[in-house]
Every structure is written in C-alpha cells, then in structure tokens.
Amino acid sequence: MTENNDIKMVIITGMSGAGKTVALQSFEDLGYFCVDNLPPMLLPKFIELMADSKGKMNKVALGIDLRGREFFEHLWGALDDLSERTWIIPHILFLDAKDSTLVTRYKETRRSHPLAPTGLPLKGIEAERNLLTDMKARANIVLDTSDLKPKELREKIVHLFSTETEQAFRVNVMSFGFKYGIPIDADLVFDVRFLPNPYYIPHMKPLTGLDEEVSSYVLKFNETHKFLEKLTDLITFMLPHYKREGKSQLVIAIGCTGGQHRSVTLTEYLGKHLKPEYSVHVSHRDVEKRKGH
C-alpha cells in the first residue's frame, strides 16, 4: 500500500442511544464501506484486508461497541498500530448526548440499556459514560446529538465527511441559550449576556437575531462593536494554530440567555467574517425554543 492510495477510516463510537446507527447509515450514503459492531481485537485483521483490497476499500467506517474493559486493551493497541501506518487517515467520531436525552430515547424505544438490562437506564448510562471517558478524550470529533433529529445528524456528518470538505479544517459556529445548557461539543464558549437585550422591547420579543430589525439593534451599540473587534481578532489568531496542531474541526459556541436574539446575531456575524478563509457551518441550536429569556 502506497501513500497515493490513502484509506480514510472513521471509527464511530460513543454513548449507546446517541445515534451510531444513523451515523453508519450516513457514511454508507457517502460511499463508505461500513461495518457495525466490529470487536476491537479484529481491527488489526481488518486493516490487513483493507491493505489487500487494491483500492476497493478506500473509505471505511467502523462502528465499535465498547462495553467491557478488556475491549479497550485491544483497541488502544490497534489505534497505536494505526498511527504507524501512513496510508491510513484515521478519525475517531464520538457520539454523545445528555443523560436525560438518552433516558428519553430508551423509554421511547422500550429498549433496555446494554449495561443495565434489568435495571434503570440511567444506571447503565452512568456506567457507560465512566467506561468511555478515555475514549472520548482520544476522539478528534465529538458530536452532541441531544438536540439533533436523525436528519440533522445526517446533515452534520455529510458536512464533516463529504468528499469536498473532509480534508478541510472546519469551523462550526453555533448560537445557544444558557438556560438550555452549554453545548457539550463546544471547544470555545463566549457569553454575550452583557449586551443590551432586545427581548425586553415588546415588538422584538417574538423575533430572533435572524431578523434584520433585531440584528441591527444588537449591532448598533458601541460595546457590541468593541466585543466583535476583540472576538474576531482572537479567533483569527487562534484558528491557524488549531489547524497546525492537527485539529480537524473547531466548535465555537456563542450564548445568551435564551439563544434567540443576541447570540444568533453575533453567530451570524462571526460566520460571515470567517467564511472567506475557512469552511464554516453556522447553526442556531435554540432559536426555535420560543419560551422567553
């Protein structure tokens, strides 16, 4: 196998119920050769098959289930072996979700958690989260699926791994509301609750930062201009260094109280500022939650 025949490999793991099945289906749609529930001890043998495939397996997605500590011993050794093979471009995609979301999903599907087959789902979730702490730390892409519908998870994966963008350094800029929690997949979090809040202007209350009247209001203040100047300078300085260190994506989260007005406005602004230089994806996690600030 030569470097001209590089193989792209994505190892998909994470919390049970966080969306591994949807993720594998998404990779299959992207033309990846997919294998689910591959025992880690078989990974070295699978790598040999990839090397002998003569280019027929140049994009591979593996769903790996880690429910016993003995599995990790095999996995760490296999990952170390991967790092020595220059013809494989590996990614570890870790799917996560809030405990409350996972419990709800188990109740909706009436399934038992694999680590608590006769007990409460939350006990199994807690045990699995402890087991996967090191795995999550080793992953180079972490996706929080708590607020994602299956279609939205597919869109995220396509954005991250489609042929046009998978080699690029990606910047995800998202708005959120602190009242709904900080995004667990955020690398950088900025709090803009110090800015004037259009929520308290009655006719702007039902609007969002996507509406011109709201964005114009937020952007007209001197403190907003000063903050954006400092923020863009900081981000512009940091991004090349993150890229140099081998990070494949950066998630920047901007939060206000409810994720409706201020954070949405500034997220849109930052996304437009970065798009000329980077592959940028802008999203608004809580913009549909019209429950007030």
From Swiss-Prot:
Pfam families: PapZ_C (PF22740), RapZ-like_N (PF03668). The keyword ATP-binding applies. The keyword Nucleotide-binding applies. Disulfide bonds: none annotated. Keywords: ATP-binding, GTP-binding, Nucleotide-binding. One of its GO terms (molecular function) is molecular adaptor activity. Gene3D superfamilies: P-loop containing nucleotide triphosphate hydrolases (3.40.50.300). It comes from the Bacteria. ATP binds at G14, M15, S16, G17, A18, G19, K20, T21. GTP binds at D65, L66, R67, G68. Belongs to the RapZ-like family. Displays ATPase and GTPase activities. HAMAP family: RapZ_like. This is Nucleotide-binding protein BC_5156. It comes from Bacillus cereus (strain ATCC 14579 / DSM 31 / CCUG 7414 / JCM 2152 / NBRC 15305 / NCIMB 9373 / NCTC 2599 / NRRL B-3711). The lineage of its organism: Bacteria, Bacillati, Bacillota, Bacilli, Bacillales.
